[in-house]
Amino acid sequence: MRPVLVVDFGSQYSQLVVRAIRECGYYAEFASPSISAAECLALSPIAIFLSGGPASAYKDNAPKLDEEILNCGIPVFGICYGFQLLAQAFGGSVKKANAPEYGPADITIVNKAFFSGQPDRQTVWMSHGDSVIRAPKNFCILSTSQDAVLSFCNRDRTIAGVQWHPEVKHSRFGKHTIKAFLSSFAAPNWDPEQTICGTVDSIRKTVGCKRVLCALSGGVDSVVAATLTHRAIGDRLRCVFVDHGLLRLNEREQVEEYCSSLGLNVSTYDASDCFLSALSGIRDSEQKRKVIGREFIACFSKLQERFDIKPHFLLQGTLYPDLVESGATPGGATIKSHHNVGGLSDNLGFELLEPLKYLFKDEVRKIGLQLGIPKHIVHRQPFPGPGLAIRIIGEVTNKKLSILRAADAIVRHELRDWTDIWQCPVILLSDVQSVGVRGDSRSCGFPIVIRPVSSDDAMTADWYRLPYDVLARISGRITNEIPEIVRVVLDITPKPPATIEWE
């Protein structure tokens, strides 16, 4: 499949560029700014998108694209910094803006090249401190503001760019613009629901006659990965659900029940004592993730002996956002380790099989429904592999886990019908003693944080506006039913700047 390459220059929105292109029906993946023209041509891309970034295109140390790529005949579209790079490369002028623009801005379309059917005046999302003040010679100016060029293209419309961020939902017509550019060169080639056969074939070819051990978490990602792999290799897949003692209330029983209904051969391994012992005394969130990753691998080594299986591959439900946040994409910075990416030991003893690692959550859900997985499983709220360990701020103990499980169960019960909430982590601030009043007497206890968010893909998120009466009912139940908790607070921070999980 010919990709659209997204060269990532460090924009906070780069992942959204990939997602927006896929939503337009074209397969997209990241490429490093260091990619050479020869490497690029070998991939036979439909087009190349240049992302935004924090650098200034006119500075000597600014990251650049191999200029031979611009002469290869491959269509190129620049966004923000990428737009400024194109202006600089073709003889235009880029300078520090009189005033930086961050947030919504009004633009005027003066040429409909890629804006057919769009209003002449529209609001877009800006995030830049530099501006293109002169377009390259023989380029057509497509939109302007009072003192800057906001978009342009060359005469044959194969080189184009915009100063704003069409990938951000606040740019209402952004995806229309992206699709208008791409459709000039190729028909759509991406539908996640149509990739099932290709993924099954790829798994079959990769695995050959070997065996696969699945680290089943019970979430939609691992269930879809297991279902696809089972289609590919049948009973040579062995699924193991590791109870690490960090699960939510009754989660083990629920996972066993619905995995059985899907026909998956699942064995449960209780490793809670091992995990809790390894986590003893650890307060740092990154260290928790690393320890949990190592313990998982240790578990799988023991499982080979217990169940007399000698798998070559370890199957995981790693997704594209996991790779991005772990810095595993070209040029990516590490935001936090994921137990199924950066938290794994270098000496696995297994070869990783990650059939979903280039997919977003919504794409996995579409595939899950196509596979016939029940809707309530497909739309289950995401739950991190390290479980409640990263929702306890401080050391993890059995007592704290019991408190958090009870609070989490209350929140999930009260929000069971709120299907448009992407996720609602419940966090125990176990290193904080908060003062309360009970029975006319002073009391002390833990604060609990609830964090309901709305999102499309977990790359960005906004806090969910729950009605006050729902919040009051949640707070009342938690403080009345769990004596160790004296305070309930609401996290109203979007992502960015905060991640969805606290740790």
UniProtKB/Swiss-Prot annotation:
Give the pathway. Purine metabolism; GMP biosynthesis; GMP from XMP (L-Gln route): step 1/1
Query: Where would I find the GMPS ATP-PPase domain in this sequence?
Result: 190-380
Write down the EC number. 6.3.5.2
Q: Where does ATP bind?
A: S217, G218, G219, V220, D221, S222, V223
InterPro entries found in the cross-reference section: Class_I_gatase-like, GATASE, GMP_synth_C, GMP_synth_GATase, GMP_synthase, GMPS_ATP_PPase_dom, NAD/GMP_synthase, Rossmann-like_a/b/a_fold
Q: Name one GO cellular component term.
A: cytosol
UniProt entry tagged with the keyword Ligase: yes
Q: Which residues form the active site?
A: C80, H165, E167
Q: Give the matching Gene3D superfamilies.
A: 3.30.300.10, 3.40.50.880, HUPs
Keyword check for Manganese, yes or no: no
Q: Which UniProt keywords apply?
A: ATP-binding, Glutamine amidotransferase, GMP biosynthesis, Ligase, Nucleotide-binding, Purine biosynthesis
Q: Name one GO molecular function term.
A: ATP binding
Q: SUPFAM superfamilies of this UniProt entry?
A: Adenine nucleotide alpha hydrolases-like, Class I glutamine amidotransferase-like, GMP synthetase C-terminal dimerisation domain
Cite the Pfam families for this sequence. GATase (PF00117), GMP_synt_C (PF00958), NAD_synthase (PF02540)
HAMAP family in the record? GMP_synthase
Q: Describe the function of this protein.
A: Catalyzes the synthesis of GMP from XMP.
Q: Fill in the subunit field for this protein.
A: Homodimer.
Write down what this protein is called.
GMP synthase [glutamine-hydrolyzing]
Q: Which gene encodes it?
A: guaA
